[in-house]
């Protein structure tokens, strides 16, 4: 409710600014398989003190062949110490840059950036104060070749332990399905309200997973809008090119022969001109074969947020940069359903365009299709695949009324890149499972994993060229000077394109919501 209020208030402000500005201007002039759950043996209960590390994670930070960003929290203001060990358990001496410990929301935040690691190696690590340390975690470094494997999830967005554990089961099954996954992209909305209580529950459910991987996090609206600084204080990221860090972080990194940019769609409610410029320069500064963009809000959706202008504005603003820079894949979350477009360029199906994937939700909050959006906010001819996890419906090329009971569950996605081939698989971890006779039974310890969408992108490698070599940072002055035209850009879209579509859509909306018992 709070997020909807913020969105409506921002839209009203947009309309007021534009109308006021206009007055001023006038006056002046597939198959299902059973995957065994990962068994984690019970460890002896550790003694918890104010120096005990919690909320531990490793994030991409800088050169993925040699660097990692580690973060953890403590209840007391203690020293920061990180120990790194090689595959044989021997301690290795590598540079560690410790940030000053600072207090945030009643706890103390520790950030340490590790550099000087060897490429293509597995390391273990522990964090602490020099006398008390965490359990050991592990990570791998990129070996720099043209092969990589990683997981993609979105929208855990829970507020109680049971739902966090349900999402953790989905993610754990993902790593069990792709045991060679080197890192995990999370497309935003880690919790529902970004409170200490919820982040502690997230940590309780996810800590054993987060200890064994590297995260590339994306800021969701529940991580940034109205909950300032939480996102940047939950991960240790390279913020050197981020246009602002208050409600999210934009950054990029190379992994193998892919260049991946993370965009903050909380920035001025949707996206600022400064960030669009950053993305264009960033994508033009790489000669990697694969260009991938990750963000939270989705320009292509049939979910409940597909009726608002902040996400739809991305279809006008961000997609223009995607088209200009020959991006291959755009991944997003936000609308808690799975949707893949045909390859799109200049708003039309084009085999040379980018594929947009709304990556579903790993969590339990799932949205169905808003039928009134069809033809007004989303052209169904652009859909290649669609799965709604709340009711198991899926797209058959013409309609989404087909149902598969096994599609009711949490989604994880896998990406495998091998030179000029990118393979994308999307799986549903069913809330329910089949018995030996094929009957649907209650969820058990061996989750049913169903491949519900798969596609492959292929291209000739070595074709991308670097066309930008300048400074891609944004000063505070540049950002705030550009904020007003950025806001007017969203407002102009709201008045000139979104509002007429809403008026045209109203009859369909009323029929669907009032007479067909649909959801708004």
Label every model-predicted segment.
Residues 42-218, 224-249, 277-281, 309-324, ...:
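Divalent metal-dependent phosphoesterase catalytic cores across multiple superfamilies
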Residues 4-25:
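Sec-dependent N-terminal signal peptides of Gram-positive bacterial secreted proteins and lipoproteins
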């Amino acid at each position: 409710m709070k997020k909807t209020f913020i969105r409506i208030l921002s839209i009203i402000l947009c309309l007021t600014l534009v109308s006021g500005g206009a007055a001023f201007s006038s006056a002046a002039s597939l198959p299902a398989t059973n995957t065994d759950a990962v068994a984690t043996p019970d460890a002896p209960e550790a003694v918890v003190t104010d120096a005990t590390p919690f909320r531990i994670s490793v994030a991409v930070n800088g050169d993925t062949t040699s660097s990692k960003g580690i973060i953890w929290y403590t209840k007391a203001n203690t020293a920061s110490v990180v120990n790194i060990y090689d595959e044989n358990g021997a301690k290795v001496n590598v540079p560690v840059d410790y940030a000053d410990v600072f207090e945030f929301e009643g706890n103390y935040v520790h950030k340490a950036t590790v550099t000087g690691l060897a490429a293509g190696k597995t390391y273990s690590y522990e964090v602490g104060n020099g006398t008390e340390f965490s359990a050991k975690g592990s990570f791998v470094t990129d070996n720099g070749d043209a092969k990589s494997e990683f997981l993609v999830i979105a929208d855990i967005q829970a507020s109680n332990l049971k739902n966090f554990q349900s999402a953790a089961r989905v993610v754990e099954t993902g790593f069990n399905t792709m045991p060679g996954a080197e890192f995990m992209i999370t497309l935003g909305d880690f919790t529902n309200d970004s409170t200490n209580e919820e982040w502690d529950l997230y940590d309780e459910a996810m800590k054993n997973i987060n200890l064994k991987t590297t995260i590339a996090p994306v800021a969701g609206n529940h991580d940034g809008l109205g909950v300032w600084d939480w996102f940047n204080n939950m991960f240790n990221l390279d913020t050197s090119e981020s246009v602002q860090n208050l409600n999210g972080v934009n950054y990029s990194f190379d992994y193998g022969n892919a260049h991946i940019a993370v965009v903050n769609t909380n920035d001025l409610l949707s996206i600022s001109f400064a960030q669009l410029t950053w993305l264009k320069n960033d994508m033009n500064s790489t000669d990697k074969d694969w260009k991938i963009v990750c963000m939270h809000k989705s320009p292509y959706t049939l979910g409940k947020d597909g009726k608002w202008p902040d996400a739809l504005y991305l279809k006008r603003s961000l997609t223009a940069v995607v088209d200009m820079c020959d991006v291959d894949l755009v991944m997003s979350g936000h609308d808690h359903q799975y949707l893949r477009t045909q390859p799109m360029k200049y708003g039309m199906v084009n085999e040379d365009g980018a594929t947009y994937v709304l990556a579903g939700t790993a969590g339990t909050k799932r949205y169905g299709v808003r039928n009134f959006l069809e033809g007004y906010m989303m052209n169904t001819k652009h859909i290649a695949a669609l799965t709604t996890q709340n009711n198991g419906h899926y797209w058959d090329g013409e309609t989404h009324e087909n149902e598969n009971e096994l599609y009711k569950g949490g989604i994880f996605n896998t990406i495998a890149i091998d030179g000029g081939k990118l393979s994308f698989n999307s799986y549903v971890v069913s809330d329910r499972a089949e018995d030996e006779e094929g009957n649907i039974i209650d969820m058990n310890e061996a989750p049913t994993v169903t491949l519900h969408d798969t596609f492959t992108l292929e291209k000739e490698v070595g074709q991308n060229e670097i066309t930008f070599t300048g400074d891609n940072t944004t000063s505070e002055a540049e950002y705030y000077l550009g904020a007003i035209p950025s806001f007017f850009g969203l407002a102009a879209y709201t008045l000139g394109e979104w509002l007429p579509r809403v008026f045209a859509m109203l009859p369909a909306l009323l029929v669907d919501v009032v007479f067909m018992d649909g959801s708004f």
